[in-house]
Amino acid sequence: VCGSDNFMATTKFDAHFTGTAAHAGAKPEDGHNALLAAAQATLALHAIAPHSEGASRVNVGVMQAGSGRNVVPASALLKVETRGASDVINQYVFDRAQQAIQGAATMYGVGVETRLMGAATASSPSPQWVAWLQSQAAQVAGVNQAIERVEAPAGSEDATLMMARVQQHQ
């Protein structure tokens, strides 16, 4: 395969929720539950409307919270990624994700801080590069077929940042 058209743009981030611990039996009203805020945010993230211009994804891959069974949780962590078929679509999902997270924090009276952990751009291969790879593959003994490109989902890849820089200098 000489080219793939479906590297999605992606943004990876953590959301740290900070509430107030309280004894869950004696004084639950003194607590501000970071776990519930993170759970509400998770549900809201997975309810983000799709974009009309292409595919999008959001995933909460990790949720950690609490310190004990009789304590209103004072902290919670979500590890989240957004994806989009284009940089614009990914930005749409990311922006909506930030709104959902802030809304959940406000709803439960807790603080939240998000921290960017990584990103990659959407990418398609250069037609000239694909043609060159195909011509080179045809010269290799044992290669029976060099497929021009695949349109199956390719996920997201850090290498797309390098690909974009190379394409800028062609």
Question: Where do the PLM segments sit?
Answer:
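An extended, acidic, His-containing surface patch that forms the Zn2+-binding/catalytic region
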Residues: 115-170
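Midchain, well-structured core segments that form catalytic/ion-binding scaffolds
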Residues: 1-125, 153-154
